[in-house]
């Protein structure tokens, strides 16, 4: 009679952690940081259709790395939670903290109860009416929450990117300066520009967005096209092009097809 295979709970959880970390390590990095007028999201993402940065609610944004189909499901679930809570109670009850708690419960339950953990790491950011009330929450695959005071880095080269970010980041930077700091940090950890190479990531390989403190109603705005290029070069964009880029509503990502590529 053969003995059944046995693995201790500790070993099972270690194996799940290693599996999730390996999946996340293959994804390109994302930087989320506070700047003078709100919160800035910058991701290395050459795709124009698969977004790693999105809007959740009026003043709440979402960024993620890992397996796209998994964090896209989390994003859509977060939107449903925020809409229902805001409708049944009050929009002021929808906060970054409440959303982060829901995500933590979901990630933790899947990690402990399912065979396969989610290969994702996410950040929930909320812009306050004053800088002191801006909040950043980073959540890992096992449901752990870390409240970041100034910035958060996720992805395969998070350590290298975070080190570069700490060297240049200052609190209260204007948008253009904060964007260049984030891009420089991402470039230091990128496989395409790192390893001592001086090149910076180009606008075509970046996804950027902001939560603007003084923007009425919906604080989320994507930075792209000539507006993004001008910010990277710190030059004023053509007025018509800048207005077009800034005035577009955030893209509706809800109907994107699932994709298992690591993002």
Curated annotation (Swiss-Prot):
Q: Where is this region: Disordered?
A: 229-263
What name goes with this protein?
A: Proteasome subunit alpha
Please provide the record's keywords in A-Z order. Cytoplasm, Proteasome
Domain of life (superkingdom): Bacteria
Q: What is its main location?
A: cytoplasm
Q: Which organism is it from?
A: Actinosynnema mirum (strain ATCC 29888 / DSM 43827 / JCM 3225 / NBRC 14064 / NCIMB 13271 / NRRL B-12336 / IMRU 3971 / 101)
Query: Where is this chain's protein located in or outside the cell?
Result: Cytoplasm
Similarity section: Belongs to the peptidase T1A family.
From the broadest rank down, the organism's phylogenetic lineage runs: Bacteria, Bacillati, Actinomycetota, Actinomycetes, Pseudonocardiales
The molecular function terms in GO held by this entry are: threonine-type endopeptidase activity
